[in-house]
């Protein structure tokens, strides 16, 4: 049986904002277990109603998800599923690949109306010149490193580092050329995202030890967004919500309690060209 592309999971109940969590490439909803376990001890998190989406690029998802040319459409489907079942999301939290796709969706013409967004370990480059050949040739190794890091965190005390590399390479094979092509395409067009269209309050979170999506990219994104705040997490890499769950829970709790900020000036994307949508 072919797995369903998008599956919605309720994580908590509450009478506060409805929050949708979106995992990254080859991950699962379990990446949110640690911060969600801390929710009862924080006012805003305790009141919030948390949902998580199992997305097609999860480790057990359908192998053909990459055949769809616009992967951000899968996030729109997750938002529509939540809206139909429980009501529209107030806040959406995206990690890694999903953070990049969420940004793409919200900068587009059919952006959902949200009260806030949280972008964790996002991929973003402000100018097309920021990409070079070394960027492209180095990304495959970064993909494997990301998979290794995720496997290590998921395994915990049961970790067998000698197996992690082989497992990570197998995951990369499972995602396949079309899946990774969707990543490349989304990443390469980040300089042209219409970030001025994004008016919701935004929290950008980056681990200072992230070897995969560097903090400099998160900082560039926060500078581009007029309503964004950048928060870095010490002693964390690409998965700050799992590596430093207490710190991440504090940041999310603080964000959910903040009033909507007044918009200020923000950076602008390059002038549009015929390559705006690659």
Where are these regions (language model features)?
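Flexible "cap/lid" loop of the alpha/beta hydrolase fold
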Residues: 103-145
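Conserved serine/cysteine hydrolase catalytic core
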Residues: 184-223, 232
């Amino acid at each position: 049986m072919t797995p369903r592309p998008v599956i919605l999971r309720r994580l908590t109940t509450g009478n506060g904002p409805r929050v949708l969590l979106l995992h990254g490439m080859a991950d699962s909803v379990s990446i949110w277990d640690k911060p969600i376990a801390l929710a009862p001890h924080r006012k805003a998190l305790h009141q919030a109603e948390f949902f998580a989406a199992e997305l097609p690029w999860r480790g057990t998802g359908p192998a053909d998800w990459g055949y769809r040319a616009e992967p951000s459409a899968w996030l729109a489907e997750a938002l529509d599923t939540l809206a139909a079942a429980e009501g529209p999301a107030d806040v959406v939290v995206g990690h890694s690949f999903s953070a990049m796709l969420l940004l793409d969706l919200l900068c587009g013409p059919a952006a959902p109306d949200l009260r806030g967004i949280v972008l964790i370990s996002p991929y973003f480059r402000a100018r097309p010149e920021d990409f070079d050949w070394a960027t492209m040739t180095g990304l495959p190794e970064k993909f494997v490193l990301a998979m290794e890091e995720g496997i290590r965190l998921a395994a915990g005390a049961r970790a067998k580092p000698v197996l992690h590399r082989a497992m990570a390479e197998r995951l990369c094979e499972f995602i396949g050329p079309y899946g990774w092509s969707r990543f490349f395409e989304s990443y390469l067009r980040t300089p042209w995202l219409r970030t001025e269209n994004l008016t919701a309050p935004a929290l950008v979170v980056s681990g200072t030890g992230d070897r995969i999506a560097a903090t400099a990219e998160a900082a560039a994104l926060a500078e581009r967004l007029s309503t964004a705040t950048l928060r870095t997490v010490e002693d964390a890499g690409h998965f700050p919500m799992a590596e430093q769950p207490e710190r991440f829970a504090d940041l999310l709790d603080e964000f959910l309690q903040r009033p909507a900020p007044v918009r200020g000036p923000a950076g602008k994307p390059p002038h549009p060209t015929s390559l705006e949508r690659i």
